[in-house]
Amino acid sequence: MLVKWEGIVIRSVDYGESSKVVTMFTRENGKLGVMARGAKKTKSRLAAVSQLFSHSYYLCKAGPGTGMPDLSQGDMLDSFRDMRQSLTATAYAAYIAELLDRLTQEREPNPYLFQLLLHTFRHLDEGRDAEILCRIFETKMLIVAGISPQLTACANCGEQREPYAISVGQGGLLCPVCLPSDPYAMAVTPSTWKLLRLFQVFDLERLGDIEVKPATRNQLKHVLRSFMDEYLDLRLKSRSFLEQLERMERMTQSDQD
């Protein structure tokens, strides 16, 4: 049986001398793995559509009892060429793709996540702020994972009393009265927790230019990574590379200053 899916490649692994196992996130069926036979050959009609980040329509042979579907052909919609040509944007895209891959199961339809990934890649391709796009994506993936921070009131007492700190252990904001309950709570500026709260409900399709101070960027990253490290315990290869790249960029900026 031939089936047609709209998907974005989030992982591609060599298989044998000439083929690839391609993992795509589809609009219709969520995450799927397909066999792209001969895709490693230079002249293969599957070479382009099986590349990482490719957004295409895919025609596959699938059916009950047939195992992994075979990719028959693809119709490229967007290769995100400009994103690929930027080392920074590519590094963030790889991290975003791996994070999505690790936090989703196969064949669980989620059109919202497909749209989130698509709009994130489109914004990266347009040269938007890759770091902020990544923070927005991380915030929304915490919701998917069921560990989204409580950011509307104190997670301990439910009262709305500022200034807030953020407690990973208690799952969100802590008011001044409850702050002693967690000696490891993180002091954050109002801008940080308000941006995180905005990111939780923000429609990425409407993204404009967002100006975020370096100190706030650092706090956003620290809070989100702390929640992921505490509750998800992910070991992402792309995150290690991204952090190396960020360190190099900070060193370059420091030398220029």
From Swiss-Prot:
Native source organism of the sequence: Brevibacillus brevis (strain 47 / JCM 6285 / NBRC 100599)
Keyword match Transmembrane helix: no
GO cellular component annotations of the record: bacterial nucleoid
Keywords of this entry: DNA damage, DNA recombination, DNA repair
The protein's role, per its UniProt record: Involved in DNA repair and RecF pathway recombination.
SUPFAM superfamilies membership: ArfGap/RecO-like zinc finger, Nucleic acid-binding proteins
One BP annotation, GO: DNA recombination
Record bears the keyword DNA damage: yes
Family note: Belongs to the RecO family.
NCBIfam families per UniProt: reco
Name of the protein this chain belongs to: DNA repair protein RecO
